[in-house]
Swiss-Prot record:
Family assignment from sequence similarity: Belongs to the methyltransferase superfamily.
Chain ranges on the Lumenal side, renumbered to this chain: 34-603
Organism listed in the record: Arabidopsis thaliana
Any single Gene Ontology cellular-component annotation: plant-type vacuole
Disulfide partners: none
Lineage: Eukaryota, Viridiplantae, Streptophyta, Embryophyta, Tracheophyta
Chain segments annotated as transmembrane: 13-33
Alphabetical UniProt keywords: Endoplasmic reticulum, Glycoprotein, Membrane, Methyltransferase, Signal-anchor, Transferase, Transmembrane, Transmembrane helix
Chief localization: endoplasmic reticulum
GO process annotations (BP): methylation
Official protein name in the record: Probable methyltransferase PMT4
Entry EC no(s): 2.1.1.-
Membrane topology per record: Single-pass type II membrane protein
Length: 603
């Protein structure tokens, strides 16, 4: 690879070129959109310079239009963004304390500035130490909030004045999280919680994850959890989980669907999550059923019954009677109960729904839409899906089988080629994550140079994940990294295969902010996302501000795209004050890499 720095804008565009690009842009705007543009994902393989179809011509014209619009604004683009005020240290767009639902309309009117870290912010400790010890200045939570609950003091210990230590065997849930997980395993019929993967449990949606102790234990069992909790101005469960290096994102389903397809998770877990399941015509429970795979489990734990008596019959009446009634209408069965924990299993037989009484909840007639914050539906989803495969029947072999690829409509040769591309690319990417490439005399790190620390990155995001093969490449190389695999809503919806592979991810519209707190990711990666977004007329300036918001200080950005778009991105990287270097892949294409690192900025 050739390392090259882009240090300025292009020469002034000639009048003829200006006119030509203007005509191309006008044609692009006037020609109706092709249906295929909203369903075809961007390719990982560098495209040919000769475009043989309308979709490619339209895409290139959109890039040319964006390029023209960008450079016609001149040197004003080079001005650095100011730092936001202290009041926005933990700013999350699209959310406020008065509305439970996500609303991004007012976020577009906010001042454009860089969200700075708090005054006492420190770089997080590397994994796995950072799982158990975090800096108090990195999260918006006070010691009083920790110590105000008697149960919390069992699992937390404050070290000196600036650290919080999470006990590895804590008192989060009754006798400890390990005992709690073992209890769930017993109700399923397993000998130990270590058998979760063998029982088909690879992915868990954890609703209201507390401080992430259950999720941390699942990670140790090679189970992938994802925590969701509503937005909180202080003491956020999501912020704490991410600070510990555990998968999490802001989310609730009070009135809208979660950004996951039907049949996404092997288990849904709710421990003291505060949800009243029998309101809104049971649509909250129906949303759990929608994202739960056939044969999957719903675990509900609540200690509220203690005040109403200690007998098993009293507990069952106070907690599960109404949920039991609803569960029968959606073909769930109560599989076990121990103490305050109840476990239901979703049917593995799709014929169950046709054998119910007429008074039962109906089956959805059409549930093939992309579930991006759509309103909740009063019907049962996913029953006609090709992905209706009970978790107990799923192949235990490593890798993705030909039959699974066929279900998802993916050609095996295309999938295998994508795997090889990312195996090779990751070797190059990882070696580039060093300040050496930003020196006055940049070079590719050699054998004599120190390699990047093995545990340098924990929280990673692939902003245009396609099949999730960057995630797979990281696992193959033994990196202790989890990846938030994001699939753009207007690209081909490949999130189902990502989740079916045991990874985590979400659908997202990159014209909007991502539902997370500031400084929560160590690395952001995107392949051809900028070209994809240019066809959507999204603001790349706002995208870079959002990337800066969610990226940790000293975190990394790796972008792969066409040369023209990468040049624009390099200029925007300077505006958000990142160190940046453009790298020539030297494969004969116009593809380039942009490698950036965010500095620790403070006022």
């Amino acid at each position: 690879m050739k390392v090259a720095s882009v240090i300025g804008l292009r020469p002034r565009i000639s009048g003829l070129l200006f006119l030509t690009l203007g005509v191309i842009a006008l044609i692009t705007i006037l020609v109706p959109n092709s249906d295929s543009s909203s369903t075809t994902s961007t390719t990982r393989v560098p495209p040919s310079n000769i475009y043989s179809n309308y979709g490619r011509v339209k895409e290139q014209a959109a890039v040319d239009y964006l390029d023209l619009r960008f450079f016609s604004l001149g040197v004003n683009r080079l001005k650095e963004f100011p730092l936001c005020g202290k009041e926005r240290d933990n700013y999350v767009p699209c959310y406020n304390v008065t509305e439970s639902d996500r609303n991004c309309e007012f976020a577009r009117e906010e001042e454009r500035c860089l969200v700075r870290p708090p005054r006492d912010y420190k770089i997080p400790l590397r994994w796995p130490v950072g799982r158990d010890i975090i800096w108090t200045g990195n999260v918006k939570i006070t010691k009083d909030q920790f110590l105000s609950s008697g149960t919390m003091t069992k699992r937390l210990m404050l070290l000196e004045e600036n650290q919080i230590t999470f006990h590895s065997d804590d008192g989060l849930i009754f006798d400890g999280v390990k005992d709690y997980a073992f209890q769930i395993a017993e109700m399923i019929g397993l000998g130990s919680d270590t058998e979760f993967p063998q029982a088909g449990i690879r992915t868990v949606l954890d609703i209201g994850c507390g401080f992430g102790s259950f999720g941390a234990h699942l990670v140790s069992l090679n189970v992938m959890p994802i925590c969701i909790a509503e937005y909180e101005t202080s003491g956020s469960q999501v912020q704490l989980a991410l600070e510990r290096g555990l998968p999490a994102m802001i989310g609730n389903f009070f009135s809208k669907q979660l950004p996951y397809p039907a049949l996404s998770f092997d288990m849904v877990h709710c421990a003291q999550c505060g949800i009243t399941w029998d309101i809104k015509d049971a649509m909250l429970l129906l949303e759990v059923d929608r994202v739960l795979k056939p044969g999957g489990y719903f675990v509900l734990t609540s200690p509220t019954s203690k005040a109403q008596g200690n007998s098993p019959d009293t507990k069952k009446t106070s907690i599960s009677t109404r949920v039991d009634e609803l569960s029968k209408k959606i073909c769930w069965s109560l599989s076990g109960q121990q103490d305050e924990t109840f476990l239901w299993q979703k049917t593995a037989d799709p014929n169950c729904y046709s054998s119910r009484s007429q008074a039962s909840i109906p089956v959805c007639k059409d549930d093939d839409s992309v579930p991006y914050y759509h309103p909740l539906v009063p019907c049962i989803s996913g029953t006609k899906s090709k992905r209706w495969i009970p978790i107990q029947n799923r192949s235990r072999a490593s890798g993705t089988s030909l039959s699974e690829l066929e279900i998802h409509g993916i050609k095996p040769e295309e999938f295998d080629e994508d795997i090889q591309v990312w195996r090779s690319a990751l070797k190059n990417y990882w070696s580039l994550l060093t300040p050496l490439i930003f020196s006055d005399h940049p070079k590719r790190p050699g054998d004599e140079d120190p390699v990047p620390p093995f545990y340098m990155i924990r929280n990673a995001m692939d902003m245009n994940a396609r099949y999730g093969n960057l995630n797979q490449a990281l696992l193959n190389q033994g990196k202790s990294v989890w990846v938030m695999n994001v699939v753009p809503v207007k690209a081909r919806n490949t999130l189902p295969i990502i989740l079916d592979r045991g990874f985590t991810g979400a659908l997202h519209d990159w014209c909007e902010p991502f539902p997370t707190y500031p400084r929560t990711y160590d690395m952001l990666h995107a392949n051809e996302l900028l070209t994809h977004l240019s066809s959507e007329r999204c603001s790349l300036m706002d995208l870079f501000l959002e990337m800066d918001r969610i990226l940790r200080p000293e975190g990394w950005v790796v972008l792969s795209d066409k040369l023209g778009v990468i040049e624009m991105a390099r200029t925007l990287a300077a505006r958000v004050r990142w160190e940046a270097r453009v790298i020539d892949i030297q494969d004969g294409s116009d593809q380039r890499l942009l490698v950036c690192q965010k500095p620790l900025l403070k006022k």
